[in-house]
Amino acid sequence: MFAKSLFFLALFCVSFAGNFTIAQDSYLLNGKPIQLMSAAFHYFRVHPDRWEDTFKKLANAGMNTVETYIAWNMHEPERGQFNFEGANDLDRYLTLAEKYGFLVIVRPGPYICAEWEFGGLPYWLLKEDGIKIRTKDPKYMEPVTQWMNTLLPVLSPHMIMNGGSIIMVQIENEYGSYPACDKEYLTELYDLTVANLGPATQYVTFTTDGPSDGMLTCGRLAGKAYSTVDFGPGNAHNPFATMRKYEPVGPYQNSEFYPGWLDHWKEKHQRTGAEPILKTMTEMYEMNANWNFYVFIGGTNWGFMSGANGGGKSFQPQPTSYDYDAPLSEAGDRTAKYYAIRDKIAEWKTLPQYEVADSEKKSFGEVAFTEMASLWDVLDVLDAQPVAGEHPVTMEKLGLDYGFVLYQTKLAAGGELRVTDVHDRVYVYVNRKYFGLIERQDPTRARWRSRRRRAMC
């Protein structure tokens, strides 16, 4: 009896190689049709102590797949210095996904958008004069190649054909929304992917774009990556009809189905009702379509990592919170929307029931601040050497990733301050007295006149 028990345990712990492929109108997992109900859950936005709890809540809601971006700037904060530990422990994240039976979709970029700082690109790329990001420019592709050749071997043991759960790997990200339209660049990314992970015959490489001809034309990589679309609640037939023009054979896939929406500074928190979500989700289910809730849990943009939307003179920065009005709140709590989605999916299949709880809330009372120091009081104790020059130097050229730079100059007389392009916020002082604020999204406030005879800015 003892020997038989050991034999059973040994079999239970073995992982088996599998495959994930495209059929006429569906995906096949090990040769059998499967419909993906996926949840976007970005490891870098949720504290690692909450990862396991989050996976349980996703499973209880009926998700069979999880999707995550991979934020390059979290893993290589400085050129050649890689970090895959703690909050960046991809191996642990993927192992937990496998523990709870999830298939995994990874979106390694290198550009990810995601309303994350610089779209996940590391700041130090901008030290290189004239670099053309998201193109085949060698100044860009050299560090991209080094990064992909470091990252993808970390993913390799977790690929479906190696006994893991990664079934899909995205090439770039919504590239049809970027004006470069560089197909050679997309091909280079694809080649890096298959060189490290193996031919895309047992897993699927794919692209994601908005459901328009212009976006799909520039964003797709025909014959190499499967073209998918993204859209929110509404008529699912129209965007899928556009997708079908570019992929005559294969399953429908909404790679970003929006159950909420992002916030911007100076705007109200976004809210999306559950009913439109359930209606479109049901429509996709009946079409045998696949979808990925973007996002099922939003989490937090830690530190200086919140991104922005915009283009040209438009600039809409995101706050620290990435709550997104998602089914799981920023704190990981189950919302009314979560229960509505779970209950609808429970009509289609039996759901697991892992024991979970929402986050504990505490009041810390009042905290009295009794001392303070101004910037000018601490300049002498800051561990920084001044850099002199005739013109302001960018933060990247100074080797500063995030935070603040103090620019100072002496003026022989008063005059007019003109700032034409600030990234992203400037506090102006004259003779150490606050003078005004310049914001990237409000350039009309970037001109002042000082009548002081002598001034220090």
Walk through the language-model features, giving the residues of each.
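Aromatic-lined substrate-binding rim segments of carbohydrate-active enzymes
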Residues: W51-G119, Y123-L125, Y190-G198, Y203
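An active-site-proximal structural segment forming one wall of the substrate-binding cleft
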Residues: G86-V106, E128-I166
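Beta-strand-rich ligand-recognition modules
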Residues: T320, Y429-C457
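Active-site neighborhood of glycoside hydrolase catalytic domains
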Residues: K139-K224
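Aromatic-lined ligand-binding clefts that engage carbohydrates, nucleic acids, or primary amines
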Residues: G415-R432, C457
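Aromatic- and acidic-residue-enriched segments that line the glycan-binding/catalytic groove
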Residues: G80-N88, E98-K99, G109-T135, L186-Y190, ...
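Catalytic-core region of carbohydrate-active enzymes that cleave or remodel glycosidic bonds
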Residues: T95-E98, F102, A195-N196, D230-S329, ...
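N-terminal carbohydrate-binding accessory modules
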Residues: F2-L9, C13-T65, T95, G101
